[in-house]
Amino acid sequence: SSHYDIGNDFYKMWLDETMSYSCGYFKHPEDTLYQAQVQKVERILEKLYLKEGMTLCDIGCGWGYLLIEAAKKYGIKGVGITLSKEQKKKFEERIKENHLEDQLEVRLMDYRDLPESGFKFDRVVSVGMLEHVGRDNYELFMKSVKSIMNPGGLFLLHYISALQEHPGDAWVKKYIFPGGVVPSLREIINIAGD
């Protein structure tokens, strides 16, 4: 969480208004970062086939934009989990600003604690968080997701992938993305296939 607890002001300097810290969906070359992030979230929410009253968990929810949009547009109830105290604080402010206290909550929680949480959800989403999990924990991550899914539930996983497995750059792993791994599609399909 230290990477995300640098302070929200630092991230505000270079992220767009959504405070989304993951890949955007640029439909057109002239799209702004803000448009790309909004378009990405809209596309993810469409793929989740949300209906009013459904429950949604966002693993690695960041500053909460995805859940806020899901609550406003689809009338879902949601829980976001993050390891960052700074993200949690800002997300709680955004929940209040949008008057969504009856629909959304954010927990300071590790995905590994989900099986014991008692939570159950119709939909689960994780955007740009799998890269932090590490190869040795992919299977545990998938089991944790499965443990909170209602029967017939849907899980959408968005991550950066590589064509093949590789250890990554030592300098980047030390100074930019400690513990981070870019998984291959094959790795994730093999684990998620169940």
Locate each region found by the language model.
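Conserved beta-strand signature within the Rossmann-like core of class I S-adenosyl-L-methionine
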Residues: 152-160
